[in-house]
Amino acid sequence: MASFVTEVLAHSGRLEKEDLGARISRLTRRVEEIKGEVCNMISKKYSEFLPSMQSAQGLITQVDKLSEDIDLLKSRIESEVRRDLHVSTGEFTDLKQQLERDSIVLSLLKQLQEFSTAIEEYNCALTEKKYVTGAQRLEEAQKCLKLLKSRKCFDLKILKFLSMELTIQKQNILYHLGEEWQKLIVWKFSPSKDTSSLESYLQTELHLYTEQSHKEEKTPMPPISSVLLAFSVLGELHSKLKSFGQMLLKYILRPLASCPSLHAVIESQPNIVIIRFESIMTNLEYPSPSEVFTKIRLVLEVLQKQLLDLPLDTDLENEKTSTVPLAEMLGDMIWEDLSEYLIKNCLVYSIPTNSSKLQQYEEIIQSTEEFENALKEMRFLKGDTTDLLKYARNINSHFANKKCQDVIVAARNLMTSEIHNTVKIIPDSKINVPELPTPDEDNKLEVQKVSNTQYNEVMNLEPENTLDQHSFSLPTCRISESVKKLMELAYQTLLEATTSSDQCAVQLFYSVRNIFHLFHDVVPTYHKENLQKLPQLAAIHHNNCMYIAHHLLTLGHQFRLRLAPILCDGTATFVDLVPGFRRLGTECFLAQMRAQKGELLERLSSARNFSNMDDEENYSAASKAVRQVLHQLKRLGIVWQDVLPVNIYCKAMGTLLNTAISEVIGKITALEDISTEDGDRLYSLCKTVMDEGPQVFAPLSEESKNKKYQEEVPVYVPKWMPFKELMMMLQASLQEIGDRWADGKGPLAAAFSSSEVKALIRALFQNTERRAAALAKIK
């Protein structure tokens, strides 16, 4: 092979292009022969797995020698071409291009040689457990294969064999690295399937082995460092750390953040550090943020020292050592989940429920800052402020949100509690809240301007006739205990707003308004069935609404000078809600009244129109209907007794009794024929109503106090006097009827129209001259 170059160099003077072409052709054929032999060797080695080490070494020697010859020949050709450009430049250029193609083929053969060498060195390193060296050799082989694939000069089948071999060896080293990782990082768990119990936590352990391994190349490394760097070289470090981080979160950090009694214990033994748990009794329902930060910081400090602060040599050949920020890498993977968990399971429970405790929260903010600074020093966190600290610093907003949420939840619980548990309200009743604070100094002048007027001389402005002190008080009645507590909650919340920041005060104020909006929507829906069926609950609900409306009239006025300035311009009012509550209570009670009226009329419909009372069956039916009506009214009188205010009670009972009496009057006046016996029996039925009707007016539990209202029945029952006149007519003579008519000026004329009186006379008396004369007087 050397003779080729010798002959070329021996020529002096002008190089014959024909002779040069012949020599290049012979050189090209030789390159193709070597290429075939190399490909055959590669195929046998990686496809047929035949031992061919000696043959490969011989081929390598031949390739190197041939490469030197080509370089010398190419240099000589270039000098000849430059010297003899006037002689067939194109032909020499073609020869040069052919020679360059041969050079490319030889360079690819060198890449094959380097690939084979890298695989051999990798196998040796893997046998000696030099994982970093092995990983680096695999990466070198990967680069060689990538270069080979970029050129289209080789058989694709051979490249496929090489790719398969590289994949197998990479999976092989990853398997060995995984086994080493499991030996160095050991998790121990409870055999129980319930991994969230305290007993399960106490059996969880993390073992970190720190034993020194033998030297890898020049620099001694701990096994963990060697394994981590090998993972890094292979591009698998991120996934391995992510898996470790998720387990760290699940089995160590989250339990420490959620369980107040759980504490981390660090045990240092020769070549091993153990992280486990112990339980310390505590009365805390939720963990203190400061304690949680301390416990988590302890665990992360151990991990930083034993695992994440190891020197990882990324360039062993040049002896340049740079520390890979493993702590920062792990922090990026777990911090978002960890901080969110700390907020939801720790910080959120530390938010004060009272504005007076907001100053104490500064300690938690400070401990949060110290916790984050410690993590930044350990490189778990970067320099920016995280969501955890932002959450802690935004305490005013969180306090307001939590307070508003607690208020709404408490209010809804009161609204969905039983209505029938009542308390008695009297005009002197007051809401049980602390005394309101005096207005701020800035507002005192305003108060004086509003309430005090300076006069040059003393004047007596007191009116001669004063109102009763209870003129604007709510009348005595019974309301639901839950509604009384609801109003106390509203007052307490507004009182809290007077000592809170402006933002918080506004939120609390509108939370109180939301309470009443919620009442308007929830109570009629939640208690709908009971309000329709039970008259007592309808009356209580009516009182509840009137009680709330009564307080809403002055609620905003009481606090208007003590709330935030933004609320003191007239927006701090609840008066706009008053009509809605009055309408809500009135509609519910009127619906119950309509239902009771319907029942009364239904019972009276079974009286067979009060006709033919001489028939025993008809009389019995009419008597039963009257008794049922009176019984219903008495029952209502009892269930509404001491519940409704006296005036509402009397109006309601008067309306219902008036409905029954009106129906009876209408039925009797519609009769066309009333015999003497019929008249007597009708009178008897009416006498029963007249005697027992007043007894339904019993608004008070003390019977002696009800006599006054029973004597005032005509005031509440418009048809009471016409009913008495009807009874008189059933027993009176024509003369007595005429006297009570008194030419349209008597009591009978006030109760009935002339046509109604004439109809009754025709029904009661036979057609005689006396009846005709009496009818003639009724005009």
Swiss-Prot record:
In-chain residues carrying the UniProt-annotated modification Phosphoserine: S3, S12
Region (Interaction with RINT1): 2-317
Region of interest called Interaction with ZWINT, as start-end residue ranges on this chain: 2-81
Residue list for modification N-acetylalanine: A2
Assigned GO CC terms: endoplasmic reticulum membrane; lipid droplet; nucleus; RZZ complex; spindle
Coiled coil: 14-130
Residues recorded with modification N6-acetyllysine: K777
Keywords: Acetylation, Cell cycle, Cell division, Centromere, Chromosome, Coiled coil, Cytoplasm, Cytoskeleton, Endoplasmic reticulum, ER-Golgi transport, Kinetochore, Lipid droplet, Membrane, Mitosis, Phosphoprotein, Protein transport, Transport
Biological role: Essential component of the mitotic checkpoint, which prevents cells from prematurely exiting mitosis. Required for the assembly of the dynein-dynactin and MAD1-MAD2 complexes onto kinetochores. Involved in regulation of membrane traffic between the Golgi and the endoplasmic reticulum.
Protein name, as recorded: Centromere/kinetochore protein zw10 homolog
